Structures are given as structure tokens and as C-alpha cells.
Swiss-Prot record:
InterPro entries assigned to the protein according to its UniProt record, in alphabetical order: Glyco_hydro_28, Pectin_lyas_fold, Pectin_lyase_fold/virulence
Enzyme class at the top of the EC tree: hydrolase
Range of residues in the leader sequence: 1-24
Entries under PANTHER family matching the protein: EXOPOLYGALACTURONASE X-1-RELATED, PTHR31736
Reaction equation(s) it catalyzes: [(1->4)-alpha-D-galacturonosyl](n) + H2O = alpha-D-galacturonate + [(1->4)-alpha-D-galacturonosyl](n-1)
Pfam families with a match to the protein in the record: Glyco_hydro_28
Family note: Belongs to the glycosyl hydrolase 28 family.
Gene name of this polypeptide: pgaX-2
Organism from which the protein derives: Emericella nidulans (strain FGSC A4 / ATCC 38163 / CBS 112.46 / NRRL 194 / M139) (Aspergillus nidulans)
Protein name: Exopolygalacturonase X-2
Length: 449
């Protein structure tokens, strides 16, 4: 970080201390109280710990800087001042132009009912973001701590100014686009009622976190130029346990939710995903010598519209190789397992495929996977109560359930699954290494893949 920016951040923190009110000021408008939102109807695998009481007199209002200057220092100072039992109110418009490490939070509420916008300074951010080793993820701020409740009450906005990032990446694949929101070690609490707009990359990366409720979110990112707004996952979970994601609307590209390695005990319910790649397990097995685990997922009552695949499991083959893409990917060779995953009550609306099991993810041709079957074993996976329509992209094929070998999949079941093709032809399901007696698929049923 440059000298001028460092000085600016320190000055911002000092100025912010003057702007923070620990006791509510007379005449101050009443801020939105934290909503009482509970997991519903499916309950979490483990009870989410109760929060501690907040001090109603420990309230920090953040006054934005003049002329759209950097508010990072003011925001951090307020969070430090009213940490441990207080509430921070962000009810105005704020610009964040320098990185924020917020992994110190404890027993705190953050009422973000205004707007936080990240400065579109591409060159600066590429040199000054927080880096994660997993898939080159990075972000301009990182949240973490214990018993944190971040809420927007339906009005709060986090805006990533994604358009210049998408435009730049269209002509230069080396541009590293930051993720809009990252948790790293967030244990206990909730994220609710926020509008996430124009993320340069994934919208949310839930990493190394636990006992977290995410609800009533509104995600929208679309490009206004010829540059494609790609890789805009709604949520990616990684090394996280006991998370509920529910009752949200997502309009974007790529996975609506993606369960990355070591995602366990997760509920996803009541989502409406439009234009996505589905609710996906994986991709897994893309790093050699690593053991990926995904287990105990319940995915309930979600509507998938205009997606490539509604329910998707994607794992790499068993040997590392250069894969398709520009620039080419390198992946595969990892091991692990996927266990106890249920997709229940999923409505398909104009989708390419309803179900896709792909143990040859990223490969150039299928023979590569037959020679090197995936080391990620899929067991106890259930698809049930799925119906709706396809868009004809693969007509009459409605789904693909393809395993790499007879040993890499076990107890894959389908119950009451049907899809209506746009042509009116009976649905066909491409299957390989499946116990077809366990598959209640509508239409023709399984055909050879």
C-alpha cells in the first residue's frame, strides 16, 4: 500500500473516532433493529448459538466523508469503537477505496441500511487485496469473528462496480477480479436483508466459518456491454460447517450456490436462482494430494430458472492434466468423498438439464476420465420431488448421471423426478455406472451415455 494511502487510512480512522457516537445522540433517527429471522422450514443440523445481548446505548453512527472520499478508516474505527456489545449504523452512502480487515469482530450488530460502494480503481485493488490460496480468491474486505449480525433490512446495498472489471477481463485474462464479500472465520450470527450488486467476481465466499444464517438476500449482477459478466457465483462455501442459506433471489451467471471442499452440514432452502449454473457440489478433486470432503447437505424447495443445470455434482478426473479453457485450466488428481446429499423439491423452469453428475469435469475428452477415474467418491445422493420444464438445449435429454467407474458412485437414487421437454418428447436420462433400479426418472428413463 502506498504512503499516501496509508496516511489517508490512518487519518480516516482518527477522523472517524470524532464521528462515532457511543451514546445515541438526541434527534438521531432511529436505526433499523436487527430482524428476528430464523431458519425455516428445515432446521440446521446443529443449533446456531444464541447471541449475547447488545448495549442499547453503545451505538456508533458513521458519517461519510465529503465529496465521495475513502470511508474505509471511518468504518473500521466505528467497528472497533462499538465492538463487544454495540451496534454500528451505516445508513448513508460510503466509498471504500482501501482494504479492510474486519476479522476482529465480537458480539456486534452492523446495520448496513445505506450503501457501501467499492472504488473502481482496478490497478490499485489488484495490488492491495486480501489473497486466498483457494482458486486465487481475493477481496477488498474480509469479515470474521464471533457472534456477528450484519443486516440490511431490505434496503442496504453492497455495490462492487463490476462493469469495469468485466470489461478489463474480457481483453486480458490475467485481470484478477476481487470477490464482493468474504467471511474468514465468522462463527455464530447472521447476514440478512442485503442487496448485492455488480460483483466483479463471486458474490460471497463463506470460508472457515460456522453456525451462520444467511437469509433474505437480493443478488443482481448483469453486464451492460459486450463483455460477459462471468464467474459470479452467489455463494461458495469452503471449510465451513453448519450454515443455512435461505429465502433469497439471485440473478447472475455461474453457480447459484457451490459447495467447495470441506463444506459440511449445510441447508439451502427457498432460493429463486435465475440464469445460473445450478446449485452445485464442487468442483472437487482439482488439486492433487488434497482430500476434499463434502457431506450432509439438504437442498430444499428451490426454484431454478434459465439454468444450465438445476442440480449438479462436478468432480475432476483422477489424474492432473491441462484442461479446456482460455487460458487452459490445470486440475484433477485429487481425492475425497461426497456423502449424504439430498436435493428435495426443486422446480425447473426452462433449464438445459435438471440433473448432472459429472466425474469428468474440465476434461477435454471422456477417454481421459475412463483411463483415470475420479478419486472423489459419491455416496448416498438423493434427488427427489423434482419437476418442471426444459428449454430444449439437449432435447430430449433431461439429465446426465455419469460416473467415472463402477467404484466411484454408490447409492445414487432418484424419486419422483420428471421433466417436460419443450418438444413434447419423453425425457431421456444419460446414465453410466448407475444402479438403474434406484432411479425413478420420468419419461424413457436411463439410456446409455
Amino acid at each position: 500500500m502506498g504512503f499516501k494511502r496509508t496516511i489517508g487510512l490512518l487519518l480516516g480512522i482518527l477522523l472517524a473516532l470524532d464521528q462515532v457516537s457511543v451514546l445515541a445522540q438526541p434527534g438521531r433517527p432511529t436505526f433499523a433493529k436487527r430482524p428476528d429471522i430464523q431458519p425455516n422450514p428445515i432446521q440446521p443440523y446443529k443449533a446456531i448459538p444464541l447471541h449475547s445481548r447488545r448495549n442499547s446505548h453503545k451505538v456508533c453512527y458513521v458519517k461519510p466523508s465529503l465529496n465521495g472520499g475513502d470511508d474505509a478508516g471511518r468504518v473500521e474505527a466505528a467497528l472497533r469503537r462499538c465492538n463487544n456489545g454495540g451496534t454500528i449504523v451505516l445508513d448513508k452512502e460510503y466509498s471504500i477505496c482501501t482494504p479492510l480487515d474486519l476479522r476482529f469482530l465480537k458480539h456486534v450488530d452492523v446495520a448496513l441500511t445505506g450503501k457501501v460502494e467499492f472504488c473502481p480503481e482496478l490497478e490499485f485493488w489488484q495490488q492491495n487485496v486480501f489473497q486466498f490460496h483457494f482458486q486465487n480468491a481475493s477481496s477488498w474486505w474480509v469479515w470474521g469473528g464471533e457472534d456477528i449480525h450484519l443486516y440490511g433490512a431490505g434496503t442496504g446495498v453492497i455495490h462492487g462496480n463490476g462493469q469495469p472489471w468485466w470489461d478489463a477481463a474480457a481483453g486480458n485474462s490475467s485481470v484478477r477480479r476481487p470477490l464482493l464479500f468474504i467471511t474468514d472465520g465468522w462463527h455464530g450470527g447472521s447476514i440478512t436483508g442485503l442487496k448485492l450488486r455488480q460483483s466483479p467476481n463471486w458474490h460471497n465466499f463463506i470460508a472457515n466459518s460456522s453456525d451462520l444464517l444467511i437469509s433474505d438476500m437480493d443478488i443482481f449482477s448483469r453486464s451492460s456491454s459486450e463483455a460477459w459478466a462471468s464467474n459470479l457465483d452467489g455463494w461458495d462455501t469452503f471449510r465451513s460447517d453448519n450454515v443455512v442459506i435461505q429465502n433469497s433471489v439471485i440473478n447472475h451467471d455461474d453457480d447459484c450456490v457451490s459447495f467447495k471442499p470441506n463444506s459440511t452440514n449445510i441447508i439451502v432452502q427457498g432460493l429463486h436462482c435465475n440464469g445460473s449454473h445450478g446449485i452445485s457440489v464442487g468442483s472437487l478433486g482439482n488439486y492433487p494430494y488434497q482430500y476434499d470432503i463434502v457431506s450432509d447437505l439438504y437442498i430444499y424447495n428451490n426454484t431454478m430458472a434459465n439454468t444450465t443445470t438445476a442440480a449438479r455434482l462436478k468432480v475432476w478426473p483422477g489424474a492432473e492434466a491441462v484442461k479446456k479453457g482460455n487460458p487452459p485450466w490445470v486440475g484433477g488428481g485429487g481425492k475425497g468423498y461426497v456423502r449424504n446429499v439430498t436435493y428435495d423439491l426443486m422446480i425447473n423452469d426452462n433449464n438445459d438439464l435438471a440433473i448432472q453428475i459429472d466425474q469428468c469435469y474440465g476434461a477435454i475428452n471422456a477417454s481421459e476420465c475412463l483411463d483415470h477415474p475420479s478419486g472423489v467418491i459419491l455416496t448416498n445422493v438423493l434427488f427427489k420431488n423434482m419437476w418442471g420444464t426444459s428449454n430444449g438445449a439437449n432435447d430430449p435429454v433431461a439429465g446426465q448421471l455419469i460416473c467415472g467407474s463402477a467404484d466411484s458412485c454408490d447409492n445414487i437414487r432418484a424419486e419422483n423426478v420428471t421433466l417436460t421437454n419443450s418438444s413434447g418428447q419423453p425425457s431421456e436420462w444419460q446414465c453410466r455406472y448407475m444402479d438403474e433400479e434406484l432411479l425413478d426418472l420420468g419419461g424413457v428413463g436411463c439410456i446409455p451415455a
